[in-house]
Amino acid sequence: MRKPIRSVLLLLVVLTCSAAALAHASEAPQLKTASSHPIQYYLSLPEGWVATKKWPVVVVIESAEREFLQAATAFAQARGSRPFILITPLVVTNGGTGYRNVPTYHYADAVWDRIQSSGPFNFDMDGVTAIMQDVKKQYSGEDKYFIAGLEAAGHTVWGVVFNHPEALRGAALICPNYLGRWVDEKTMSSAADRATLPVRNFVGANDTLCVAGHPIYTQMQNAMNFAEAHGYKNVSLTRVEGKGHERLADEVLAYFSSLIH
């Protein structure tokens, strides 16, 4: 009888390990708050994460829809076996005004007062910096991070690119807005890192909103021209066949993967 018992025990161990692996793979992004700043963010660790090695970090900026959990989940599902720690901060610079009443935020009145007094971009930038400090300390994230976002996320992403290129490993913008918000030519970064920073714009070939002559396409072109005029020499545009106006999470993560190999 011993042999069948050992077989049953072995089967139970295998099933338990398989279930644990499946649970980790399908685990939803977790909502957290930075330890030194009130900004909140969704965290998703990669499959096989361990604290004994360094991991690349992708900061996902949501569009003006402000469906932060949807964005976090979309990138987590697209990640597959790629080694990225995914961070989706609840930023406030990704679109127009009136965001205080958006139900996907979870900030207390005191936090909203802080946003108003410090300014939206200062809140977001200081917040992302605080998040990265936590991610480096608690989850072995790398010092620099990748950043990506669709449409109105461009306001935030371009703001980071033009003010803090030294913090980034690369940026991906999908049909991005750009109106010069949070960017002042007198104070924008002159860090040498900007010259080689990889900045890629993505447009779905079937995206009818992001075609020549449309406002958002013109904004994207203006941002690229502004970047090149201010010493950013690694700015590119790529079209993705078969895709429309969408996050292009898989394409973005594939691009970032190409930068770490």
Q: Where are the language model's segments positioned?
A:
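Bacterial N-terminal signal peptides that target proteins for export
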Residues: 1-9
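Bacterial N-terminal signal peptides
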Residues: 9-19
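A domain-start/cap signature at the N-terminus of enzymes
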Residues: 21-57, 70, 84, 120, ...
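Serine-hydrolase catalytic machinery in alpha/beta-hydrolase-like enzymes
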Residues: 37-42, 53-140
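Soluble non-cytosolic domains of exported or imported proteins
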Residues: 55, 118-126, 151, 162, ...
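Alpha/beta-hydrolase fold nucleophile elbow
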Residues: 139-151
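Conserved hydrolase catalytic core segment
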Residues: 159-169
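The feature captures the conserved acid-bearing segment of alpha/beta-hydrolase catalytic domains
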Residues: 170-251
